């Protein structure tokens, strides 16, 4: 006799926006009964699956902060049900944010002409952006598509945040080293409230003692001060700001430019080399 196949159904209660609040909807999941995707590439998750994804990606990204795929998964797993809706609502309440949601622009090498950006005058936003890309050895095509956010519009909001991240780097001048990433993520947390950006602060534990001290004394106060004081950076239509003066845009947004971290690190290395050379000379 063929054994009966037992199917276990998990009922998930998820928050959906409704008017000025949220309503809870029940959704049945099983290995044989998964809802269809809401947009290309969408992967619906149960509450248990989302929790496992959040925990696993958090641990993995802490062990290896350079794993962008894990950081992206952590961002999506922890953004719902509230935080990504808050960010979407911030866009809806702003005229430029509403235009972005309507136009759905994407940032990639197909939508931005890198050669044109290199031709712009120094200190324009576009020239600053491409100069930062060249200096850090990265490109605009490294952002993975959103998969785990159920609401299609909110998925775009997360994609937009993700693709604008390098503009945040460029406008602040922070490099892609772990110290710079943690500083920028702290700024983003104060500005966007996305949990992943706040959780990224745990990567401070992986910094060297001197870097950790520099974060607490220099980067953290700057990030909180600028993140809270500045306008919502998700509402910047970067594609329309490329020819503007970068200092003018920073002033308009209320972003204080931090100390040049790469120059600080170079200075510290030179100082350490000089001290070691002096010790070696004294030992002769």
Swiss-Prot record:
Reactions performed catalytically: a 4-hydroxy-3-methoxy-5-(all-trans-polyprenyl)benzoate + H(+) = a 2-methoxy-6-(all-trans-polyprenyl)phenol + CO2
Membrane topology: Peripheral membrane protein
Top-rank lineage group of the source organism: Eukaryota
This protein's pathway: Cofactor biosynthesis; ubiquinone biosynthesis
BP-aspect Gene Ontology terms: ubiquinone biosynthetic process
Pfam families attached to this UniProt entry: Coq4
Cofactor requirements of the protein: Zn(2+)
Residue runs in coiled coils: none
GO CC aspect terms: extrinsic component of mitochondrial inner membrane
Keyword annotations of the record: Lyase, Membrane, Metal-binding, Mitochondrion, Mitochondrion inner membrane, Ubiquinone biosynthesis, Zinc
Locations listed in the record: Mitochondrion inner membrane
Documented EC number(s): 4.1.1.130
Range of residues in the leader sequence: none
UniProt-annotated binding residues for Zn(2+): 165-166, 169, 181
Keyword Manganese: no
Family stated for the protein in its record: Belongs to the COQ4 family.
Subunit field text: Component of a multi-subunit COQ enzyme complex, composed of at least COQ3, COQ4, COQ5, COQ6, COQ7 and COQ9.
Role, per record: Lyase that catalyzes the C1-decarboxylation of 4-hydroxy-3-methoxy-5-(all-trans-polyprenyl)benzoic acid into 2-methoxy-6-(all-trans-polyprenyl)phenol during ubiquinone biosynthesis.
Misc note: This protein may be expected to contain an N-terminal transit peptide but none has been predicted.
Stated name of the protein: Ubiquinone biosynthesis protein COQ4, mitochondrial
The organism of origin for this protein: Ajellomyces dermatitidis (strain ER-3 / ATCC MYA-2586) (Blastomyces dermatitidis)
Gene: COQ4
């Amino acid at each position: 006799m063929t054994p009966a196949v037992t199917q276990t159904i998990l009922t998930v209660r998820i928050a959906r926006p409704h008017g000025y609040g949220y309503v809870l909807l029940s959704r049945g999941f099983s290995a044989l009964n998964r809802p269809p995707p809401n947009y290309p590439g969408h992967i619906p998750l149960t509450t248990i699956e989302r929790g496992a994804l959040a925990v696993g990606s958090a641990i993995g990204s802490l062990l290896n902060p350079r794993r962008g795929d894990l950081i992206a998964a952590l961002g999506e797993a922890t953004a719902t049900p509230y935080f990504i809706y808050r960010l979407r609502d911030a866009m809806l309440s702003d005229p430029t944010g509403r235009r972005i949601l309507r136009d759905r622009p994407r940032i990639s090498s197909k939508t931005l002409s890198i050669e044109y950006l290199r031709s712009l005058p120094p200190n324009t936003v576009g020239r600053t952006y491409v100069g930062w890309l060249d200096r850090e050895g990265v490109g605009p095509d490294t952002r993975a598509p959103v998969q785990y956010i159920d609401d299609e519009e909110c998925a775009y909001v997360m994609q937009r945040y993700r693709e604008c991240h390098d503009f945040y780097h460029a406008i602040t001048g922070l490099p892609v080293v772990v110290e710079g990433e943690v500083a920028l993520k702290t700024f983003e947390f104060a500005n966007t409230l996305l949990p992943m950006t706040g959780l990224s602060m745990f990567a401070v534990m992986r910094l060297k003692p001197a870097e950790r001290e520099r974060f607490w004394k220099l980067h953290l106060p700057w990030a909180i001060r600028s993140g809270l004081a500045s306008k919502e950076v998700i509402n910047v239509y970067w594609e329309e700001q490329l020819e503007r003066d970068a200092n003018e845009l920073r002033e308009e947004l209320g972003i204080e430019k931090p100390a040049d971290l790469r120059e600080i690190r170079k200075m510290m290395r030179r100082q350490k080399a000089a001290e070691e050379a002096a010790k070696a000379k004294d030992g002769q």
